[in-house]
Amino acid sequence: RQLQKFRYVSGNVTEDEKYLIISATNSTTGNYLFFKDLETMDAQIETILDDSSSDAYVIDHHDQNFLIVTDRNAPNTKIVSAPVKNPTPDYWIDFISEKDSPMTVSLGGNYIFVEYMEHALSTVSQFNYQGQFLRILDLPGLGSVSSINGKKDDQILFYTFSNYSTPASIYKLDVSTGQSELHSQSLIEFDPSNYVSKQIFYKSKDGTKVPMIITHKKGIVMDGDNPTLLYGYGGFDISLTPSFSICLLYTSDAADEHS
């Protein structure tokens, strides 16, 4: 296949520097996937995925298999193992199966970290390279996690955590224990411990339970008479996840609570 026929082409090298992975597409969804053996002189570009009906990307090469994150036959995404000798979908084997919640994947410390979005909140599961579930990470609170990444030989990884009362803070993660420790945080003159966040569910008109995060100062009596800022968003398959805003914080002080 002539790669120049595609509108967008990108490439990356696996961490072990053995394979060049090439993604090609003509639109913003769905992609073709190819690879080239960098250890074999005059190696040809080989095909992994020969249609653009799904999104797929290689996250690693391990034990003569590509680990691929894909939404092929899995709307919420899964990880499959594809043998290098026969990497096309007919030979894919589920490595970490799809769940009811969407997933994003990070690597580091010779482990795989899968972030699931459950009711608009982050939960992170740790797996080994045999696909075995090890633990759910104990996060600093109800909020959003991003950027758990590192090299395979790293024993300490870093990630960012935030919610409506916690500005973006960097935590260090011990991959052997799954324990986190605050590394650094934004310098803002306020005390997060003065605020409370909790999740509730509101039944909409059609019976759907809609998750809501309520944030307010400690000590407020929740009697239904407090001024409240209510904000929501729904569209384009985008979920509104907790994030810190100094403007919302000041609004909370004035309005008593927001959700």
PLM regions and their residue ranges:
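Single conserved hydrophobic/aromatic residue that forms the stacking wall/gate
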Residues: Y250-S259
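A broad detector of the eukaryotic-type serine/threonine protein kinase catalytic domain
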Residues: G234-D237, D256
